[in-house]
């Protein structure tokens, strides 16, 4: 029995029903199934016109998924890799900056819970947060606030 051929539009809608996708990401996924004569860009334009796909919704979704675990630079880097509009990135950066210290403190608390007793332990904790994309300023503020709470 032959498999039914799923149209590109149906495949795109299935992807979009699971989660928001950027234009670039959806084009890459659909390119695997495109046949000669298929116009992926026209399909993506149609999906955007019908409001099935939105750069703003994708950005908001990605920020919401990543904010609990990662810092501003990691989130912004991922958004840049999806070719998000630079004006949107500026707005997102401003919004993320407001609570970066609190998010760094939350990530640090989940991972470590207590302040390190020596310099090596403190460096390890700082490296962990740096790898997660938090700024030096946010890391120092988060760790300083935690140490003050323990005293």
From Swiss-Prot:
InterPro entries membership: RecX_HTH_1st, RecX_HTH_3rd, Regulatory_RecX, WH-like_DNA-bd_sf
GO cellular component: cytoplasm
UniProt keyword list: Cytoplasm
GO biological process, one term: regulation of DNA repair
Pfam families assigned: RecX_HTH1, RecX_HTH3
Location in the cell: Cytoplasm
Protein role: Modulates RecA activity.
Annotated family: Belongs to the RecX family.
PANTHER family, alphabetized: REGULATORY PROTEIN RECX FAMILY PROTEIN
Name of the protein in its database record: Regulatory protein RecX
Species this protein is from: Herminiimonas arsenicoxydans
Lineage start: Bacteria, Pseudomonadati, Pseudomonadota, Betaproteobacteria, Burkholderiales
């Amino acid at each position: 029995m032959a498999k039914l051929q799923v149209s590109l539009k149906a495949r795109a809608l299935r992807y979009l029903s699971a989660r928001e996708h950027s234009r670039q990401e959806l084009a890459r996924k659909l390119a695997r199934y495109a046949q000669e004569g298929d116009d992926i860009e026209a399909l993506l334009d149609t999906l955007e016109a019908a409001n099935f796909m939105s750069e703003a919704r994708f950005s908001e979704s990605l920020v919401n998924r990543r904010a609990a675990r990662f810092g501003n630079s990691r989130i912004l880097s991922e958004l840049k890799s999806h070719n998000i509009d630079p004006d949107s990135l500026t707005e997102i950066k401003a919004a993320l900056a407001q609570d970066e210290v609190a998010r760094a403190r939350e990530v640090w608390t989940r991972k470590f819970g207590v302040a390190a007793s020596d310099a090596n332990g403190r460096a390890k904790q700082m490296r962990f947060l740096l790898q997660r994309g938090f700024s030096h300023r946010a890391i120092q503020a988060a760790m300083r606030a935690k140490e003050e709470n323990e005293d």
